[in-house]
Design a protein with these regions (language model features):
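Pol beta-like nucleotidyltransferase catalytic core
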Residues: 258, 262-325
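Surface-exposed amphipathic alpha-helices with a cationic face
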Residues: 99-106, 188
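Nucleotide-sugar donor-binding catalytic core of glycosyltransferases
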Residues: 1-73, 80, 90-97, 114-250, ...
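A short helix->loop->beta-strand "cap" motif at the edges of active sites that frequently abuts
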Residues: 105-108, 131, 259-261
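Short acidic/histidine-rich motifs immediately flanking catalytic phosphotransfer sites
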Residues: 81-85
Length: 325
């Protein structure tokens, strides 16, 4: 099939999907949102003018110019092109007119929501324009009738050696968020006997000032791939802290499944998935953040390949495409 995918690949999560689709014989065009809908101020005066316009006339001139730039790009891009499927992951940044223009060059236009509608409500303002909506959030699937889709793990991930050397009990790495940071400090307070390593990535100096807990390590550059694995694999458990406004499982669950590494999470939706086992996944709540010592002591319970492989990227992509038809 001829597939167009429009989205953001900040965390490098879309590129593996594109590569696997191509590996399976599909022709895939991937466009970053920033290539379509980007407008930068040409002069400081423009920024000031926009601030005045928003304050006095409720008009966002930068947004209007960005929308115009998007319209011009789409008019040129969609001309003489046609796709079997077009997938958008961030519909909130496009107007109804933009989506209608995209729809003219495709047989089926699909929305794939990587965030819940509670967290990103603008994602569904033009949802009726899509032929199908896929969502990782079970609450949205139930409420709106969206098609469920999980996250995945990459094909090359294999179980960690169970007899490897350990530096500690729990490892967690996160981008800064006030809600998440408060939960992290509470978790640390509740588990003083555990050896826990927490790293928080910040992309602005003002955020650094908000992290005052000395138990938290601040990083200013993202850590990914083999560098991250070298750190995380030295701990018995991975810490996952999701937003209260969404219940879909993060990529940490699926990577932990591939690595056969235990995970601690505040997302109790994990208990409803076929790969759940109490030896491997420990759920905490706002009211009870204490991790049972037994959870760390008992061995990892092997999950059958039949269940585990459902989330491996090659099999996942095959199911993903079928779900859009």
């Amino acid at each position: 099939m001829n597939i167009l995918l429009i989205g953001i690949d900040n965390a490098g999560l879309i590129t593996p999907i594109v590569e696997e689709m191509r590996q399976q014989g599909h022709a895939v065009t991937f466009i970053e949102n920033g290539e379509i809908s980007r407008y930068d101020y040409l002069h400081p005066v423009e920024r000031i003018s926009n601030l005045i316009s928003k304050a006095l006339f409720k008009r966002n001139l930068k947004q209007e110019r960005s929308w115009l730039s998007t319209t011009q790009f789409l008019n040129g891009f969609t001309k003489n092109r046609h796709f079997d499927i077009t997938i958008l992951t961030n519909p909130d940044i496009y107007t109804a007119e933009h989506l209608t223009q995209i729809k003219k060059c495709t047989n089926r236009m699909i929305c794939h929501l990587w965030d819940s509608t509670l967290r990103m409500p603008n994602n569904i303002k033009n949802i009726s324009l899509f032929d199908k909506v896929l969502s990782f959030d079970p609450q949205d699937v139930k409420k709106y009738g969206f098609t469920p889709v999980t996250n995945y793990y990459k094909n090359n991930l294999t179980p960690l050696q169970p007899n490897r050397n350990y530096d500690g009990d729990v490892f967690g790495i996160f981008s800064f968020d006030r809600e998440r940071y408060a939960f992290i400090t509470a978790f640390l307070d509740a588990n003083p006997d555990l050896k826990i390593k927490i790293m928080i990535y910040v992309d602005h100096q003002r955020k650094i000032k908000k992290i005052r807990d000395e138990r938290v390590e601040i990083i200013t550059k993202p850590i990914t791939g083999d560098e991250l694995l070298a750190i995380s694999s030295a701990y018995h458990c991975i810490l996952d802290i999701g937003y209260q406004s969404q219940k879909g499982l993060s990529f940490r669950f699926f990577e932990s499944l591939a690595y056969e590494q235990k995970i601690i999470s505040n997302n109790n939706t994990a208990e409803t998935y076929p790969f759940f086992h109490p030896n491997n996944i420990f759920c905490i709540t706002d009211e009870d953040l204490k991790v049972s010592p037994d959870f760390l002591a008992i061995p990892y319970h092997h999950i059958s390949d039949e269940i585990k492989n459902q989330y491996r990227l090659d099999i996942w992509v095959n199911k993903y495409i079928k779900a859009m038809l």
